[in-house]
Amino acid sequence: DQPRSRGLGDVYKRQEQDGNQPFLMCCHFKATHEPYDYPIRMEHLYDGVTFPEPENLLDWGPETNGRSFKGQTLEELERRWRIASQDPDKWWCRYPGLPFSTEGMQRTAARRASYQKFIRDYLRCGATVDDNIGKLLNALDEMNIADNTIVIYVSDQGYFLGEHGFFDKRMFYEESARMPFVIRYPKKVPAGKRLDDLILNVDFAPTLAEFAGVKMENVQGDSFVSNLEGNTPTDWRKEIYYRYWTNHAIRPAHFAIRSDRYKLIFYYARNLDMTDTENFDFTPSWDFYDLQNDPHENHNAYNDPKYAPVIKQMKKDLLRLRKETGDTDEKYPEMQELLEKYYNK
């Protein structure tokens, strides 16, 4: 509630001073981030509701789908709830709805119970954000500036809501990698349009600059104003590059490439000179997904021979993107050796 009230106060004040001057307001909501703490007015929202489960909620890791890593599962979140239930002062944050424990439950029942608590807390936070965004939009209507104001709702990443049994983010699965981006600008953007082009967050700044009539040079991203207007350039990117540096056993360091249909990930699992890492035994490995035939990424198809030509080309494209972005790890001889050793494994 606080980001909305402060943001509205600034807008009202600016409009009273000079309603003809342009303004920029950034209103940052953190509510759906752990610990998923919602305001008191939402504490009974969804009481008694049993939420539908993701089809792969009971994904138990490499044994289930052949992926290369365990992942940050709901069992870890339940462990945090349990510690905080016993002594809240021993944990870094305050979770709502405690005490909570799955002690004594079978593995499947415990995960399902943890999911129901997690998604209920999360959606209560989401409802709070939604409520406040509605108030912001209503304020623009009241000031008669809605049609001349660009409104964007965006996040810094996606989030796992029980898919693969996960919570949190970080990994290059669709739920985590896909960022919400919703824009309202009646003058330029048709309502109800959905864009399937590959967009990166480095594209946001040049896009906003073009809307504002500002020319930007020497930037990494590309404006997608034309895409939003229904005129995607013929030379628009066909692949995107991703890297996650922090290295832990449940979420090893990796880099990846994604096209409109395929995804290839290399888990190198080395600390390099990063902080917040740990040492563990892990053999570097590849994961590959066909997003058309396996949209929920339930089967690592890296060793399926029918995909060998696709994987071979994607590895070449991955090296090209690493070079284009300047992310070649030249200062890490260890990484050069790893790539050479595992490139064709």
Residue ranges and their predicted role:
Residues M314-L318:
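Short amphipathic alpha-helical coiled-coil/interface segments
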Residues C27, Y46, N227-L228, I257, ...:
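A generic structural signal for nonpolar/aromatic side chains embedded in well-ordered alpha-helices
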Residues R14-Q21, C26-I199, E210-V219, D273-T275, ...:
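Active-site-proximal cap/lid insertion segments
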Residues D1-Y12:
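Single conserved hydrophobic/aromatic residue that forms the stacking wall/gate
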Residues P22, Q157-E163, V202-A205, E210-D287, ...:
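C-terminal cap/loop subdomain of S1 sulfatases and analogous C-terminal strand-loop tails that border
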